[in-house]
């Protein structure tokens, strides 16, 4: 894999291995390769709701991993992945604006189709190692995940993972924040659909 996510002081919360204190399910889902959408599909019927698509600046901990300037314009896509109608993951994808009109232009036309359709069907796409972190209030991802709960009380912390995809040398970063309903499902039903465990 050619692209490595780099770390500096602002990115200290992102780790190559999950933090101590993560449950076994959390460690598993934070480090699973392949398509998260495909993994969720084993639990039930997956739907994608787009909550935002816009040109915006990157979050404070994103530019270094994308080799970009702190205020460089980016194309941002935010979605909620639900299983059987219940939100399980809040996802934030970001690519340099030029890349969203070039190598990653198809991400602008996905609508409610999962980004995984682009990332795992093209042999020219490479993926970095996954990194993960605990997300608490103050990080923009916490606000995104809390909003996805649709009024339910947010936990003190979420866990999230992140990786960079490259296509023809242009980056696209995907950050996926797991929501409490995912962990409740795994506790009750294991790694399969409701009623299977």
Curated annotation (Swiss-Prot):
Cell location: Cytoplasm
Hydrolase among keywords: no
Metabolic or biological pathway, per its Swiss-Prot or TrEMBL entry: Cofactor biosynthesis; ubiquinone biosynthesis
Superkingdom of the source species: Bacteria
MF terms (GO), sorted A to Z: chorismate lyase activity
Single GO BP term: pyruvate biosynthetic process
Any Pfam family the entry gives: Chor_lyase
Predominant cellular place of this UniProt entry's protein: cytoplasm
Enzyme Commission designation: 4.1.3.40
Known catalytic reactions: chorismate = 4-hydroxybenzoate + pyruvate
Keyword Lyase attached: yes
Cellular compartments per GO CC: cytosol
Family in the record: Belongs to the UbiC family.
HAMAP family: UbiC
Role according to the record: Removes the pyruvyl group from chorismate, with concomitant aromatization of the ring, to provide 4-hydroxybenzoate (4HB) for the ubiquinone pathway.
Official protein name in the record: Probable chorismate pyruvate-lyase
Organism: Burkholderia ambifaria (strain ATCC BAA-244 / DSM 16087 / CCUG 44356 / LMG 19182 / AMMD) (Burkholderia cepacia (strain AMMD))
């Amino acid at each position: 894999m050619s692209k490595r996510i780099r770390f500096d002081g602002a990115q200290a919360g992102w780790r190559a291995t999950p933090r101590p204190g993560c449950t076994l399910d959390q460690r598993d889902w934070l480090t699973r390769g392949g398509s998260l959408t495909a993994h969720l599909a084993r639990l039930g019927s997956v739907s994608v709701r787009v909550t935002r698509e816009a040109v915006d600046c990157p979050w404070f901990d994103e530019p270094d991993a994308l080799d970009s300037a702190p205020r460089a314009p980016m194309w941002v896509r935010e979605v909620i992945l639900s299983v059987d109608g219940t939100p399980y993951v809040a996802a934030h994808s970001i690519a340099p604006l030029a890349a969203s009109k070039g190598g990653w232009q198809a991400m602008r036309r996905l609508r409610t189709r999962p980004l995984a359709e682009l990332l795992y069907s093209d042999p020219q796409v490479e993926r970095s190692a996954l990194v993960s972190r605990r997300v608490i209030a103050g990080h923009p991802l916490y606000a995104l995940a809390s909003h996805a709960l649709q009024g339910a009380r947010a936990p003190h912390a979420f866990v999230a993972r992140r990786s960079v995809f490259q296509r023809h040398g242009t980056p696209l970063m995907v950050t996926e924040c797991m929501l409490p309903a995912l962990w409740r499902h795994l506790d009750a039903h294991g790694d399969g659909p409701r009623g299977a465990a």
